[in-house]
Structures are given as C-alpha cells and as structure tokens.
Amino acid sequence: MQLGWKHFKEEEEDHVLVPLSRGGGSRPVKLPLSTNKDELMKTCKGLLFPDGKSIFGKEEEMTFHLANFKNEKIEVTVNVDGNELPFNINNYIDAHKVKNVRIYLLSQKPF
C-alpha cells in the first residue's frame, strides 16, 4: 500500500499534497490486512513526523485525519456491501474494490 500526506493550506482552503522534498511523498509500506484505523494513524505519524516533528510544526500542535484516494475522511467503520464493518485494510479493500491501496494522512494546524 501507499501512504501519502496532505497538509491544510489556508490560502487554498484545502489539504495539499506534501512532496517528498518536504518530508511527504508517496511511501510504500507493508502492513497486515488486519491493521485498524488507530494502528494506521500511528504508522503514518511515525513515518511522516519523525521525532514528532515536520516542516509544518510539531505533531502535538496539529489535528489529524486519514483520507482515501477520493479525499474522503476515513471513519472507524466502512460500508462493505451494505454492512457497516470496523475499518481495517482488508475491509477497506472490499469496500472500495481496489487492489492498490493509497491512504493519506491529513494534517492541519488549528487557526
């Protein structure tokens, strides 16, 4: 799967991709299909905020969400064929009918 990072830019009023040169980029990772939302968030923060820091500031100064390839926030459940199931990578694949998973860490500093 691929992990990416989008940080909120006030002037764009949207989350914008962070390039590799600024600590983002598209990062290939191997995770168990049973990985849940909290575990995935922890992996993203560890990868993109080494030592709790980034080019945009400290981890504790920001709010975070996970988003799918359509920029929709990932919730604790996912709809698979009309059934609400707990989010994990396997259920996400089933819900979106994708083979190559791409998930984004969304970060924002409070105003």
Locations of regions flagged by a protein language model:
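Phospho-regulated scaffold assembly regions enriched in serine/threonine/proline and acidic residues
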Residues: 1-111
